Amino acid sequence: MAAALLLWTAGTVCAAPIPWQSQKFEYVADRKDIKEVLRDLGASQHVMTSISTQVEGSVTGSFNETPQKFLDRMAGTFGFAWYYDGAVLRVTSANEAQSATIALTRASTAQVKRALTRMGIADSRFPIQYDDDSGSIVVSGPPRLVELVRDIAQVIDRGREDANRTVVRAFPLRYAWATDHRVTVNGQSVNIRGVASILNSMYGGDGPSDSGTAPRAQDRRLDSVAPGEASAGRAGTRALSSLGGGKSPLPPGGTGQYVGNSGPYAPPPSGENRLRSDELDDRGSTPIIRADPRSNSVLVRDRADRMAAHQSLIESLDSRPAVLEISASIIDISENALEQLGVDWRLHNSRFDLQTGNGTNTMLNNPGSLDSVATTAGAAAAIAATPAGGVLSAVIGGGSRYLMARISALQQTDQARITANPKVATLDNTEAVMDNRQNFYVPVAGYQSADLYAISAGVSLRVLPMVVMDGGTVRIRMNVHIEDGQITSQQVGNLPITSQSEIDTQALINEGDSLLIAGYSVEQQSKSVDAVPGLSKIPLVGALFRTDQTTGKRFQRMFLVTPRVITP
């Protein structure tokens, strides 16, 4: 052992270098005890020293060299070993050298080796032997080195044991849904995927679903309606009169970003379906994730060292969504009035005012408008009028209210009507549904029984908003799906014919702007009979005393959709 220590002291490389205060050490000794000499060395260099009582010898001579070279000269001459642990320089005799074998149960030898090197404990003068197959470490050297290596190895091994220990944690959610939700809209199944189901799908534990495959984002139903048999006769009749008494405008399924399959969860997979990652121990199993609907929490059973990753992911999914107000106006304008409105068409938003006209009609005044076009009415009065051409001017405030003001003016002469003006609050990336339909049932005879076949007609407006932050500007992206239809007077086999029109569009607008959708016409017919009582019912000649009059109007239907952020 003494010979080995002499070989160890020959080198000067250590993981934690001694912080010498100077590069020159001058010293003169005459039969001075080696322990006092080493204390003088440490005191002059401001290095704490701990010298074993078993270190013996006397020093005589004059020395002028670096502190490190002087220490190595003394170690080689008197046969002691020194070790610096980062705080104290420890000097021990060769008889105090120790050797230890450390067995690891959980941690790997590579983990211990990296920790010793990173902490500055390993010293190249005292090589440490590692055996990966048996998980063993052999260390020999000064007592302090052996003690530190043993302590660090035990801490790492115990930490790995604690990390591999299976624990169960509950993560309560504040905004997202933990469980899957199923709702029915127009006879079709809507699946809203919860956080627990999303996590299960990431770890390969997506359980079977009782509703089939979830719809894709580009599907017609705007991420909400699962594929299935379409409801019969989805046509349309009258427009939306109000929100009261109809279906709930919002599906109770939660936020729109969690769309997918639902149903019972499958047990954790094994074998090739297990999660593999370079950062996770291959001996670990796939986590078990369940949802607690009572507390709206996600329960995770997994190793303790993975819980931090689960918590970070769940917190990112449980983000606070913005609250938006979707205001929709369904407007019917007669074609004659639409031509007039087209002449005096005025488009507004928060930044510009574009107006065209023939200069004869009264202009909608806006206090914030910068234009002051006027036309002479009579001989004395000057009134604001529409310009004879396109004029670009700035407007303070929103733009949709000016169009609504002109529509309200047309209502006075029965040339326009606002058939519905619903408002609904919804969450960011959650579809808002405004639906008003008429349903009637047609009996269909079967072999042993008769069934009722449902036919629905009406107006359905679905808006899926998403708040987009573009620098400091708030923009709103909308997916809009409109179904508008009516029951016609024509019949086939004593059944009325329904007509239906659909509109699918997307738009990215600034907050406060409106999206105007138009182009479909609606017919309104009325019949009146003027007759002479009694005489009009005489056979053959009764028609001479009766007048039948049928009048009809064609309306152009417009949809004005205005989103607004209530709570960002």
Curated annotation (Swiss-Prot):
Pfam families: Secretin (PF00263), Secretin_N (PF03958). It is found in: Cell outer membrane. Residues 243-257 have a biased composition (Gly residues). Its main location: membrane. One of its GO terms (cellular component) is cell outer membrane. Residues 273-284 have a biased composition (Basic and acidic residues). Gene3D superfamilies: 3.30.1370.120, 3.55.50.30. InterPro entries: Bact_Secretion_Sys_Channel, NolW-like, NolW-like_sf, T2SS/T3SS_dom, T2SS_GspD_CS, T3SS_OM_pore_YscC. Residues 1-15 form the signal peptide. Keywords: Cell outer membrane, Hypersensitive response elicitation, Membrane, Plasmid, Protein transport, Signal, Translocation, Transport, Virulence. The keyword Signal applies. One of its GO terms (biological process) is symbiont-mediated perturbation of host programmed cell death. Component of the type III secretion system (T3SS), also called injectisome, which is used to inject bacterial effector proteins into eukaryotic host cells. Forms a ring-shaped multimeric structure with an apparent central pore in the outer membrane. Belongs to the bacterial secretin family. T3SS SctC subfamily. This is Type 3 secretion system secretin. The gene is sctC.
